[in-house]
């Protein structure tokens, strides 16, 4: 029996994008695996996060999203590290799905770190000085010490190897997945709006998308833009044809995927990118960035464009509308390649590999 502690004390519910989907699904998929016993350790603010494996709540820690508040959570976890480690002492492996090893495992435990991407090293201009320092000490330095790193794309693996000089055999790639039972494809008529589900982080590239839509509306003046995700109030001066939905329930997002003319994904950088796959599972045509891991995820089932050029974004959206029926069919084939069960199996094999190396 392999005992694994999923230490998620830096979790901020509703504030961590696709990484939160990944970690939650991991708690579901690791339940009931023969010869594996996993327990999730979560902060008080995330009580009830686990969807399958047992959960232990650490009451002294409450996750928040700003850099100072995240640092405070790490300091708190470190201050109470003895008692937290005692609670996790039965685990042979401590796995940190949210990257930051807080608290560090004991010397008697193996240490696995999930590193979703190294965007801060590829694009430091998108981060504050404080955030870069935080990631240097709590992302990069621990990664060099980890027994194994799990990442979510070949693109991310190559960038981790490049920046952190880590041998390829110490990095496992586990593509994320989509639960197709949660998405009902619509291959029929669609409405006159473009959907972009993303938080207002700088690399999500909302400003260029609005410029692209302005160009596109010269040909299609009825076309609207619907934005979902957290922090959208930070986007100022949006035209009246842009609709800000903010954070919405999963069923509402699935409905938007079913009805949108196109799901656009103009991100400048992704370690993976779940929304294109979710859109494909809904039969929605996808126009997406040609940067980062996005081509690896989308394959030939999306129109790819240069996200740095508003004209290219506009052209990509228009092509996706025109090729809608074909993209709907090829998207279904593409999304079938990405399952949470396969993601789980690669994690389980990573755990077993770490035990074999001990």
Q: Language-model segments: which ranges?
A:
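Carbohydrate transferase catalytic cores enriched for Leloir-type hexosyltransferases
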Residues: 1-358
């Amino acid at each position: 029996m392999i005992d694994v502690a999923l230490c998620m004390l830096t979790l901020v519910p509703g504030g961590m994008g696709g990484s939160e989907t990944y970690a939650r699904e991991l708690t579901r998929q690791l339940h009931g695996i023969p010869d594996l016993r996993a327990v999730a350790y979560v902060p008080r603010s995330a009580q009830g996060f686990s969807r399958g494996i047992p959960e232990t709540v650490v009451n002294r820690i409450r996750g928040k999203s700003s850099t100072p508040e995240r640092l405070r959570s790490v300091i708190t976890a470190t201050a109470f590290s003895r008692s937290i480690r005692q609670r996790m002492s039965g685990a042979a492996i401590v796995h940190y799905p949210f990257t930051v090893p807080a608290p560090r495992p004991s010397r008697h435990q193996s240490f696995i770190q999930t590193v979703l991407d190294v965007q801060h090293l590829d694009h430091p201009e998108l981060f504050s000085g404080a955030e870069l320092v935080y990631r240097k000490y709590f992302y990069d330095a621990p990664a060099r010490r980890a027994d194994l790193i799990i990442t979510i794309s070949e693109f991310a693996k190559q960038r981790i190897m490049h920046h952190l000089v880590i041998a390829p055999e110490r990095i496992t790639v586990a593509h994320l997945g989509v639960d197709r039972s949660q998405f009902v494809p619509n291959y029929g008529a669609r409405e006159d709006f473009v959907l972009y589900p993303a938080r207002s982080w700088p690399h999500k590239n909302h400003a260029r998308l609005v410029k692209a839509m302005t160009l596109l509306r010269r040909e299609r003046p009825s076309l609207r833009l619907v934005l979902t995700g957290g922090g959208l109030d930070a986007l100022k001066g949006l035209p009246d044809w842009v609709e800000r939905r903010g954070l919405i329930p999963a069923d509402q997002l699935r409905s938007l995927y079913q009805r949108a003319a196109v799901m656009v994904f103009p991100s400048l950088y992704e370690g993976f990118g779940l929304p294109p796959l979710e859109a494909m599972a809904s039969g929605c045509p996808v126009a997406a960035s040609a940067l980062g891991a996005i081509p690896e995820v989308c394959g030939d089932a999306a129109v790819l464009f240069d996200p740095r050029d508003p004209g290219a974004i506009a052209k990509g959206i228009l092509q996706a509308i025109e090729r809608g029926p074909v993209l709907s069919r090829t998207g279904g084939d593409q999304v079938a390649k990405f399952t949470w069960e396969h993601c789980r199996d690669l994690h389980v094999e990573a755990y077993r590999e770490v035990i074999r190396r001990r």
